Structure formats: C-alpha cells, structure tokens
Amino acid sequence: MQPSSDTSNEPERSPLRRYGPIAAILVVIALVAGASVVMSGDDEGDDDLAEDTPVDQGYPEGVVTWSMAQDDESLDAEFPDTCDPETGKVAIPFFFAPECTATVEPDPDFTGPGVTADTIKIVLWLPNESDIIFTFIKQALGFDDTVEEVKETQLGLVEIFQEYYNTYGREVEVEFVQASGNMNDSVAARADAVKAAAMEPAAVLGGPLLASVWTQELHNQGIMCVACPGIEDPAPTSFGLVPSETQLNIHALNYVTAKLQDKKVEFAGGDLNGKDRVFGQLVLAQSENSEENARELRDDLEAEGVEVVKDFTFALNLGGAAEFATSTVTDMKEAGVTTVLVRGDPITLGDITREATKQDWFPEWVMITPQLLDTNAGAQLVDKEQWEHAFGISYLPPSSEPELNPAYKLYEWYHGEPPPAEGSLLLTYPQIALFFTGLHLAGPEPTPETTRQAAFAFPPTPRARTQPSLNYGTELWDGDVDYQGIDDLVELWYDPEATITDEFGNEVTGAYQYVDGAKRFYADEWTDELKVFDPDGAIPKLTEAPPEEEVPDYPSPAGG
C-alpha cells in the first residue's frame, strides 16, 4: 500500500475472509448512525431549487404545529387524538417524537411525485440474502435476522408511524427493492436504482451502502432519498445522517486548536512527554474528495498556527498495509512527530501501531472521528501498547443496553413483542423515522420541496447523551446548507485496563471511556479543558438513560 499523498503456519485465507467481518463493521458502524461509510465529501453545494427560493422559509403552507397554535389562537387548529396535550408532542414513547401538527384535509385534486389524494408511495431497500457483506454483518454482530424478518420489521415500524404521525389523510404504501448484487456492486446498484425509480415513489429509503451510484441515479431523477449512500452534492433531494467530512474537519480543527495547540505533550510514551507537540496526520480515503478534505484540514490547522509536518491519505487495503506502515512510521518518527491526528480504520492502524511499537515510537494518537477505531471491537485490532495513548472525538454514542434503543422500546410498546429483526433494528429504523418526520411536517401537499422546507424548519433534536442531535438547514455550520444529520460529538479516551462487553457481545479487556458521562459537543463548544485519561465522571457505556432523557409512559396499544 502506498500513500496517495505525503508531505505462521496457518492455512492461507483470502483477504476478504480474513478481514470480512471487520470490513463489514465499517459499514455497520455507519449504519448504526443511519448512513453510509461512503460519506459525502462536502454537503454544501449548489441548490437545484429555484434561485429565488429562500433556504429558511419556515414550515410549508398548511402546517400548524402545537406551539404555533398556542401562540396564535386565531389559527383555530384541531389536533388528532395521537397528540399529547401535556407535551404538545406525538403521544408515543420515543425520544425523537416531533411536535404535533394540526389535522388538515388534503386537496383532493393535489398530486405529486408518488402522491395521490389518499396515498403516498415509498420504496424500501433490502439487501440480497446471498450478499457476502450482509452475511458478514450478521456474523459480526451475532444475529441471524433474515431478509424476510428485516422486511417484517420495517413494515411494523411503518405501521407505528402511520398511526401516530400526521400523514394528512394519506395511507403510506410500501414497496421493496431487493438488491440484485452485493452492497459494493455499482453496476447492480445502478440497475436497482432504475428499478426503484420506475415505481414512481415519493421517496426511497436506504440503499447499498458501498455503492453511491444508487443515490446518484435517484438524485439525477429528482427522487428523494433518505439515509442513502452519500454523494458529493446532495441538494435538494438526498438527506443523510452521518456528518460530512467538511463538518468533521471543523470539529477536528476546533478540538485541536482549543485543547492541544501550543501545549506540551502529555499522553505519549517513551521520552516524548514534555516536548512541544509536533503534529502528523493519517486519513482514510472514504470518498473521492477525502484527499482534498485532508489537505484542507491541514491548511486550516496551519492557518491557526498548528503545523502538520507529515500528512498521509490512504485507501483501505484488506490485504494489509505492512509496507505503508513501515514507511509512514519511519517518516513520522524521523520528522519528530509527537501527536498523530487519525481518521483511519483499525486494519491499517493495526499495522501502523505494531510498526510503531517495533520502532519504539509511542506518540499521542488523536482520533478525529475515525471509522471503527472509536469502537471497542475496533480497538482490539490495534497495538495495545500504542492505544493506551489514544484519545479524541467521535460521533457515535457509547454502547448501551438494547432497551435503550429508542426503536426497540417503541416497537415492543406498540406490538407487544420485540421486533422480528431485533439484531438489525439499528440498521433499519432511522430512515423510516426520518421519512415520517418529514412527512409529518411537510403539510398536506408533500413534495421534495415541501419536505426539504420542513427538514430545514425543524429545530435541532434535543441534546442528549444516549443519542446524537440532528439538524438540517442553516441553523448551524455558519449558515452553510446542511443535508447531513448528526452535529454533536463526544470526547473519549482508551483505557487498556477496563473490561467490557464489546459490540459483538464479547468480553474484552480494553475499552473507551467517555468524558463527562458521554456529554456531546457542537463544533463551536470545544473548550481548552482537557479531561481525557481522567476517570472522574468518565463512563465506558450507558446502562440507563439520564432522567431528562426518559420518555413519557403511555398505555401500550398491545395491552398488558
């Protein structure tokens, strides 16, 4: 393996077999957040809506929220029985329950893409049962959900939101497109997208996570795509959940300049502590723009007085990265690097950290939202002598008990039993919840334009510790148009002595500790206080929701 930029006797196994579960979890970790590892390089692009259409117009015409009605009695709004008058929110035990909207009869003559007077059609993507990546995902997470069980669970979730969210008298019709190839098969993905588009839906939910041509094809046809693989310019129809690389750069810039700039090395090994910090950077190429984004972060840091003396961007190589590791470690060590900024994967970092130990070089490893490295399972793949010097930021919340999963609680509350595809629930519910929230707030005339308008008018979801906060539009990021979702991050550090159950359900030694009980921070909230490697207030996982994050207790429709 070569950087794209610089400044035993065990039977032989194929690289994919050797690393298959790990590569799959790179996908899963993004799926848990509801979006793709193939992230958009920059989500601030030209908006294809009319140039004279303002980005922030408030809610679309016909939408009356609970708070609007309380502020203006002349609206004379009526709300459905599914509204809780105590909270003004939809009456379900769901952390992301939106504000109630008033009952409005749709115009019987209105039609839109995938919309009639009494129906609205969506297409849900399903994996191919024989997809080797889907099989690896199931093996890695230890569940045996079938595609049919995933389908049944999705329909069960649609049923819940259909009953409680405002669809303005329309029944949501669900059709499915099952992948004809593996998740990384671009040819199959494009053909499947054409098939989905031919169904003429109002929206498509999900997609093959390693084939962004799926999203691009739907985008080219003007079809709304929710939690689909990321593309460079999502405006105005594609909505993701994971932060863009540009947004992650802003977090990294603010974190480094606030907490590490002009300070002595404190958390390294060997003879590095006490020296002035000298920075290097390692970035995994996640999109065609990754190298450019890495260069922009380096330039932005240097503009703030933080020199990055060595800078490497690399591609994931399932066959290993020994040659790259040797040259990279040698270059950084000879350049006097004390602190390495890492946005990488555990496969490559496994080779790099083992080489660093071999060369007796123990720098600080600062994670700037890496892929899988910020999970306990991923951390098992790197050299422990090195990783005890690791800390940084992540958009993933700590691991938690299944009962803390908002969708698990909601499904069991409504249906009276756990979801059929319990193991993969985190892979299936976010896009459904996001779509119905957009529909709930888009008003009686749902179109890609009114849905976008609703998403941009919707305020950021509540700040929490068990869940990230999501927002779309221009309220954050200095007014840049945001088509991604997650905006706040946690701070964490690696504790080599902690024992925990990892994401596979395995008992492991070595776990991440989350600063201040997993408190989350917007990009402009990072301060100069550095509490990594301080056990006071740190937690390795969430075992219960904080009192302020408890959801209301409503009678179950299933009885009991």
Each language-model region and where it sits:
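N-terminal extracellular/periplasmic Venus flytrap/periplasmic-binding protein-like
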Residues: E51-A188, D192
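Beta-alpha junction/loop-to-helix N-cap segments that form part of ligand/metal-binding clefts
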Residues: E148-L155, E163-E245, F314-E323, G350
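C-terminal region of N-terminal signal peptides and the immediate post-cleavage residues
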Residues: V32-V55
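Extracellular/periplasmic periplasmic-binding protein-like sensory domains
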Residues: E355-P430
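Extracytoplasmic ligand/sensor domains, especially the bilobed periplasmic-binding protein
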Residues: E78, P201-F312, E364-G392
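Solvent-exposed, acidic/polar segments of extracytosolic/periplasmic ligand-binding ectodomains
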Residues: D56-D109, P113, D118, P460-G560
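Short, charged, surface-exposed loops that flank catalytic or proteolytic processing sites
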Residues: R170, H440-Q453
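N-terminal export and membrane-targeting signals
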Residues: S8-V27
